[in-house]
Amino acid sequence: MVMADTNETTTDLVPTNQERMFALSQREAVGLSKSGLVPKEFQGNVANCLIAFNLAKRIGADPLMVMQNLDVIHGRPSFRATFLIACLNQCGRFTPLKYRITGEGDEKTCIAVANDIETGEEYEGPPVSMAMAKAEGWSTKSGSKWKTMPDLMLRYRAAAFFARTTAPEVAMG
């Protein structure tokens, strides 16, 4: 009997920690993909669930919470404003977000503001106005909440812009 010459050692046969973690994530993703509580983009789609698991791991969040607050816009994952606000408010870097609203009509503008907890320095996000909402087409889409809840939508958009420009690590890990 001739034994095959191999350079494999027994340690090559033992899965690495990374491989074990991926296998565990994959099993969890399969389970969640079968749930009716996850959004339709994740139902029956293990690959999308794995991407959500990756995002959750990077930002230290629960995978189901990430899935329920993630929208796919033009093929890219984008967190809902309420999720970004929650992440910012609990990250420990800033005071809770506040909003400055000025003007009326198309000139109504909202700026999200927070202070750095360590230094007290104030940070402002980019201004968001009703004129911007119209120019970008946000307020003219069918079923748009910009028509019925403009103040809330201004706050949401201003908060999302603040998160993306001032603290992108909060949502990207």
Predicted regions and their residues:
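Polyanion-binding surfaces on beta-sheet-dominated domains and ring/shell assemblies
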Residues: 2-173
